[in-house]
């Protein structure tokens, strides 16, 4: 029956003229006998294990591939069903490698499956090529270690068939090259190195291909769990920071208090001018602490005493409530304050001009101008002393700038 259907199919392909009833009968026979023919073809396929010496009932790779190419055109079924039937014809290492390849690539097609079989179990390459490919197979960027070890196994089998690596040294060669070419975490790398060192003379106790795959997959599962937990904690911290009330920066004003005066110093901002404005008043007018209640902003009133300090860095003119220099200076109990440096104009005491000091003055030849300036200064001092004698003496506020 099979031969009759085959002859009729060949005649149809050759465009041989057939009566209509023959075409109708042929279509009916194909629909009814097609599944039966596929089952018969599958049963006729020989087994393949990938071993160097095939066992009884097994075929070499070349004979197995020829049979597969013959029956594939008669399999009218999905790609998944074809793969399932092909894998059923495999045994031993060939079945293990192809199952792992299918697990790593769920959308594996029949063409890709046969291509992988040719790479692993096909004709041996030259010894130089096989040696170079195996020892230069490295993990690609972004590739999982479990997929890398499958690619490495393909090159290892090629090297074994080329006679470069002995079958008994397969586990040691696989593990050694895997440690060289894979990106692993510290724990797994330490375990594999320890195994390689412990069983250097007992290679049969080293992990096989399947055992190595299992160890790698377990480590990858742990890494995935750790990454998920880390991402969850990070998202929680981001949410916590987002819901936390925002504390605006800026240091509070500094209160300087003694028995005579109170001073509030406010830190500079980028928009401040070059002058410091300090409000000076009686003790009862200023708050003792800023921790009890927030201070209210107030402007300088006409009755307030306002001190404008142009250059507070001149430490040679100290005052009871202010001090020069930079940083913090203690002028007495309760009188700690922070001062700031200001730019000031340099005036020469030799010639009276601005822009340079006495040490760099080059106007020594102008003696007449120097003596004239000195006489004017002495006259001003004499007039000031006479006015101070005529005016009544009044007690001065220690906070006022003389």
Swiss-Prot record:
Interacts with SMAD1 and CREB-binding protein (CBP). Forms a protein-DNA complex through its association with SMAD1. This is Zinc finger CCHC domain-containing protein 12. It comes from Bos taurus (Bovine). A zinc finger (CCHC-type) spans 346-363. Pfam families: PNMA. GO terms for cellular component: nucleus. Residues 383-392 have a biased composition (Basic and acidic residues). Residues 268-277 have a biased composition (Acidic residues). Transcriptional coactivator in the bone morphogenetic protein (BMP)-signaling pathway. It positively modulates BMP signaling by interacting with SMAD1 and associating with CBP in the transcription complex. It contributes to the BMP-induced enhancement of cholinergic-neuron-specific gene expression. Keywords: Metal-binding, Transcription, Transcription regulation, Zinc, Zinc-finger. Residues 268-342, 383-402 are annotated as: Disordered.
């Amino acid at each position: 029956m099979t031969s009759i259907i085959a002859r009729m199919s060949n005649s149809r392909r050759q465009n041989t003229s057939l009566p209509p009833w023959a075409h109708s009968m042929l279509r009916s026979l194909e629909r009814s006998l097609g599944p039966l023919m596929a089952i018969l073809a599958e049963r006729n396929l020989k087994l393949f294990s990938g071993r160097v010496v095939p066992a009884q009932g097994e075929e070499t790779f070349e004979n197995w591939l020829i049979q597969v190419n013959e029956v594939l055109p008669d399999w009218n079924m999905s790609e998944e069903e074809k793969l399932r039937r092909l894998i059923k014809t495999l045994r031993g290492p060939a079945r293990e490698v192809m199952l792992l390849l299918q697990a790593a690539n769920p959308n594996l097609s029949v063409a890709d499956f046969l291509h992988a079989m040719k790479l692993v179990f096909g004709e041996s390459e030259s010894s130089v090529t096989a040696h170079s490919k195996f020892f230069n197979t490295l993990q690609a960027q972004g590739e999982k270690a479990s997929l890398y070890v499958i690619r490495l196994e393909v090159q290892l089998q090629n090297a074994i068939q080329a006679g470069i690596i002995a079958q008994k040294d397969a586990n040691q060669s696989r593990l050694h090259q895997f440690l060289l070419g894979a990106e692993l975490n510290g724990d797994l790398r330490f375990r594999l190195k320890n195994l390689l060192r412990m069983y250097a003379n007992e290679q049969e106790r080293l992990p096989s291909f399947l055992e190595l795959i299992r160890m790698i997959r377990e480590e990858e599962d742990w890494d995935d769990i750790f990454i998920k937990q880390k991402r969850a904690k990070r998202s929680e911290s981001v949410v916590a920071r987002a819901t936390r009330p925002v504390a605006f920066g800026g240091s509070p004003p500094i209160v300087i208090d003694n028995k005579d005066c109170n001073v509030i110093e406010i830190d500079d901002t980028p928009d401040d001018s070059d002058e410091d404005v300090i409000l000076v008043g009686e003790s009862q007018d200023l708050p003792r602490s800023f921790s009890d209640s927030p201070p209210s902003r107030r402007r300088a009133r006409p009755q307030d005493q306002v001190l404008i300090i142009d250059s507070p860095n001149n430490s040679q003119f100290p005052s009871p409530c202010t001090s020069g220099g930079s940083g913090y200076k203690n002028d007495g109990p309760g009188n700690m304050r922070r001062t700031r440096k200001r730019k000031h104009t340099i005036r020469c005491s030799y010639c009276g001009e601005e822009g340079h000091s006495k040490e760099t003055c080059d106007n020594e030849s102008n003696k007449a101008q120097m003596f004239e300036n000195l006489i004017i200064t002495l006259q001003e001092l004499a007039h000031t002393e006479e006015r101070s004698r005529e005016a009544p003496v009044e007690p001065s506020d220690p906070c006022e700038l003389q």
